[in-house]
């Protein structure tokens, strides 16, 4: 399957999220809301061993641990994993890539991965890895962003300089196809956040590490003049600057 993310730069992703580790939780209200919904979709599963794949600062690792799970926290960004470890969010910590999980087959009862797989070069490979490390009878819970996310920002940048400067996300049809090999459920949600100005909007993205990374570029776009041009081009509704997220939540059942 062709991915929208074929040129994703994993080193740039790890570096950006490591730098954002200190400010991530304060900026990550959407991430918390999405993760809490995803957690609720699997919280009744009786399995004990849980992998938090792309754990970030360990916010959800901690929530799962408090629910009695034995949590292994995995992240590509050393800075994020350091914060999770300092917070004693999990029982075990692994530095690694979700597309090459450093675990044996059938090691986990639950694999949880919230707003992570959009950074993968190959979504089917990432899901196959999570399936591999999950025991029969277990579940894989994931959420991701689909095409149409950050649409307003991309459209505004296009007016400024002819380039979109936002990450490419897979169409929902490709996400569905990636899940089709498994017994699964997939639900979607459109969430729009509003900001008082474009600078606040851009800082919210930088605060969670979600700058433009799919071609290895991060930041470097924002002189005062370019910010003014972006704000002038950005759609404003009743004094607010909207940013849309097209979300997909998946539950895959390990046979």
Curated annotation (Swiss-Prot):
Q: In which pathway does it act?
A: Cofactor biosynthesis; biotin biosynthesis
Q: Name one GO biological process term.
A: biotin biosynthetic process
Question: What's in the keyword line of the UniProt record?
Answer: Biotin biosynthesis, Methyltransferase, S-adenosyl-L-methionine, Transferase
Instruction: Quickly give the catalysed reaction.
Output: malonyl-[ACP] + S-adenosyl-L-methionine = malonyl-[ACP] methyl ester + S-adenosyl-L-homocysteine
InterPro entries, alphabetized: BioC, Methyltransf_11, SAM-dependent_MTases_sf
- All disulfide bonds of the chain are none
Q: Which GO molecular function, any one, fits this protein according to its record?
A: malonyl-CoA methyltransferase activity
Domain of life of the native organism: Bacteria
Give the coiled coil ranges. none
Q: What Enzyme Commission number(s) apply to this enzyme?
A: 2.1.1.197
Per its UniProt entry, what is the enzyme's top EC class, as one word? transferase
| Function recorded in the entry | Converts the free carboxyl group of a malonyl-thioester to its methyl ester by transfer of a methyl group from S-adenosyl-L-methionine (SAM). It allows to synthesize pimeloyl-ACP via the fatty acid synthetic pathway.
Q: Record's family?
A: Belongs to the methyltransferase superfamily.
Q: What is this protein called?
A: Malonyl-[acyl-carrier protein] O-methyltransferase
Origin species, per record, is Serratia marcescens
């Amino acid at each position: 399957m062709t991915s929208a993310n074929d040129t994703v730069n994993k080193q740039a992703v790890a570096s950006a999220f490591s730098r954002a580790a200190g400010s991530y939780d304060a900026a990550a209200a959407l991430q918390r809301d999405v993760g809490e919904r995803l957690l609720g979709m699997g919280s009744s599963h009786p399995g004990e061993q849980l992998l938090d794949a792309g754990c970030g600062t360990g916010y959800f690792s901690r929530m799962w641990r408090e629910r009695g799970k034995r949590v292994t926290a995995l992240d590509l960004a050393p800075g994020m994993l350091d914060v999770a470890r300092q917070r004693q969010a999990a029982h075990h910590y692994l530095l690694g890539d979700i597309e090459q999980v450093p675990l044996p087959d059938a090691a986990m009862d639950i694999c949880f991965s919230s707003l992570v797989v959009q950074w993968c070069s190959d979504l089917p490979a990432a899901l196959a890895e999570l399936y591999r490390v999950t025991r029969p009878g277990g579940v894989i819970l994931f959420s991701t962003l689909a095409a149409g996310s950050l649409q307003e920002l991309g459209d505004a940048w296009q007016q400024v300089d002819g380039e979109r400067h936002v990450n490419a996300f897979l169409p929902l049809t490709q996400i569905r196809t990636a899940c089709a090999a498994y017994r699964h459920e997939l639900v979607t949600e459109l969430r729009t956040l509003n900001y008082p100005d474009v600078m606040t909007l851009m800082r919210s993205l930088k605060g969670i590490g979600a700058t433009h990374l799919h071609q290895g570029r991060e930041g470097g776009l924002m002189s005062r003049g370019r910010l003014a041009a972006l704000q002038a081009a950005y759609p404003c509704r009743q004094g607010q600057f909207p940013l849309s997220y097209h979300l997909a939540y998946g539950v895959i059942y390990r046979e």
